Design a protein with these regions (language model features):
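Core beta-strand-centered patch of the WYL/Sm-like small regulatory domain
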Residues: 1-97
């Protein structure tokens, strides 16, 4: 799974997966370690979420991601992070350029 996420970030490709029972379509931006757990920070652009707010920034625990696929859809560039709530990482492994 890690290799798929890294490839999607490097190629700026949109990914889809199931998380907490919801279908997500996400622009992956950061793969890293937060509180000792591998996580993905992405901008969810389609799908659904328990919060109901889309599009929105979301952190995902890698261990809870299911049915991960790289889509044949590119995203143009790194989006601006609207707040500092996603800024803490123990280690950032890869950031979209």
């Amino acid at each position: 799974m890690k290799n798929i996420i890294i490839a999607a970030i490097k190629e700026k490709k949109v990914i889809s997966f199931t998380y907490s029972g919801f279908s997500r379509v996400v622009e992956p931006h950061i793969y890293g370690i937060n509180d000792g757990l591998p996580q993905l920070l992405g901008h969810q652009i389609r799908g659904s979420s328990s919060s109901g707010v889309i599009p929105e920034w979301r952190r995902f625990n890698i261990s809870a991601i299911q049915n991960l696929q790289i889509l044949n859809e590119l995203f143009p560039d790194r989006r601006s992070f609207s707040s500092g709530k996603h800024s803490h990482w123990d280690k950032q492994i890869l950031i979209v350029e």
